[in-house]
Design a protein with these regions (language model features):
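A polyanion-binding, active-site-adjacent surface
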Residues: 2-215, 221-228, 234, 256-259, ...
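Conserved active-site loop/cleft motifs that coordinate metal ions or position small ligands
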Residues: 216-219, 249-251
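Short, flexible loop segments at boundaries between secondary-structure elements
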Residues: 237-281
């Protein structure tokens, strides 16, 4: 089966999976099926994930959903947008929210916490305690896990943590909502162009709201490219919101900074920087 046909079938009546408020934001825009490379084929039994609401593919977390990022958060309440690239490449890990790893029930090592997520959780520990033992030097992650084991440090499980942030208005959204195989042809010739109109409308809407402070977070060049490609700054400038109620937070990717740039946690407080940016445009800090 062609990838394009499979995506059209998967996304039939896709608005059923989002709230009326988000549906209104996305009024008049559709996934761009015509932009999906017609030469891309799915192998027999190959799965596109995450799935539709209530229809998680085998091995996926039951609540995982293509539109999970939009659950339990009203468009007017978004105050931070954490931009990711695409879903995790394993069905058990992809939830529909950027950076969230779906196969984890704790942070103690099984399954293995992805390197990017390790550093985000280290940033959470720093934001909560101010203790750089959890971020600096060899063995910082091991020190964090050791304190979790003894109860000296408490960090909620992945789903609870992301649910709590989402309830505070933090939108963890990817530039690409679906995935089927680790192959750039499928990623950039199939899934990315499919979702481009949806992502552009969503981000431009958030950038253009009057009186609604929001910080867009770009950790890494690809996240920044996604925001720039959607025209976030241009939309905010046109609406008169740029540097007034809309701002951008840039930083290295949690996993691999570009050559010559410092790592994600090097001398930085990434989540504190987000709260400072939100405060500059009149928003309330996030309880990380």
């Amino acid at each position: 089966m062609k990838l394009r046909d499979a995506l059209e079938s998967l996304l039939e009546d896709w608005r059923d999976d989002i709230s009326p408020r988000w549906s209104a934001v996305l009024s008049g825009v559709e996934p761009d099926f015509a932009a999906v490379d017609d030469s891309l084929e799915l192998d027999p039994g190959e799965v596109i994930f995450p799935g539709r609401r209530g229809r998680a593919p085998a091995g996926g977390r039951p609540d995982s959903c293509i539109f999970r990022a939009l659950d339990s958060i009203d468009p007017d309440d978004v105050r931070v947008v954490v931009m990711g690239q695409d879903p995790y490449t394993h069905v058990a890990q992809a939830t529909g929210r950027s950076f969230e790893q779906g196969d984890l029930t704790d942070w103690l090592g099984k399954p293995r916490v992805s390197p990017s997520l390790q550093r985000i959780i280290q940033a959470v520990a720093l934001a909560r305690t101010g203790d750089r033992r959890f971020t600096d030097g060899a063995g910082a992650w091991q020190r964090l896990v050791a304190d979790l084991r003894t109860g000296a440090l408490t960090i909620e499980p992945s789903m609870t943590l992301w649910d709590g942030w989402q309830a505070q208005g933090v939108l963890f959204v990817n530039a690409i909502f679906t995935f089927n195989r680790f192959d750039p042809r499928y990623q950039f010739g199939g899934h990315q162009p499919l979702w481009r109109p949806i992502v552009r409308r969503l981000l431009v809407h958030l950038a253009g709201r009057a009186g609604r402070p929001v910080a867009f977070v770009a950790w890494g060049g690809k996240a920044l490219d996604a925001l720039n490609g959607a025209g976030v700054e241009a939309a905010a400038r046109a609406a008169g919101t740029w540097d007034k109620t809309v701002t951008l937070v840039r930083g290295p990717h949690p996993n691999a900074p570009p050559p010559g740039q410092p790592p994600f946690l090097h001398g930085r407080d990434p989540l504190g920087e987000v709260n400072q940016a939100v405060a500059r445009v009149g928003g309330a800090p996030v309880r990380w």
